[in-house]
Amino acid sequence: MTGNNMIKKALMPNPEDRIICVKVGKVKRENLYEMTRKYWKVDITRARKATHVLAIVNGIVQEVYIPVDWKYTDDPKHIGRCEFFGTEDEHTTYIGKDVSDFYGKSQNPVKYINM
């Protein structure tokens, strides 16, 4: 099947995974990490418990990161927002999965799963 006829596979998270999904705009692959990692309104205590951060574009997981640390940004334009530092999860099965059911009609770009 191709195009709009493709069946989207829903994300079925591992129960042990603590996931933060963040919606990012359509970006070039080389910019995806930077777009995913910073300037989020999150509860930093809760965010630090996350085992995975998923980059979401149009409801689909584009990349998965393992966060190493979260901190409040030093950027004066984004006071009170958080950013993480992490690495790509090379063993993930989440890429290409649909997360639309987790967001519903929510406009919030951040979604917590299993947290």
Question: PLM ranges: what are they?
Answer:
Residues 1-61, 91-115:
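Compositionally biased, charged N-terminal/linker segments
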Residues 62-72:
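Short beta-strand-centered aromatic/proline hotspots
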Residues 66, 76-77, 97-98:
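Short conserved micro-motifs at the rims of enzyme active sites and ligand-binding pockets
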Residues 72-87:
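Short, solvent-exposed secondary-structure boundary/capping segments
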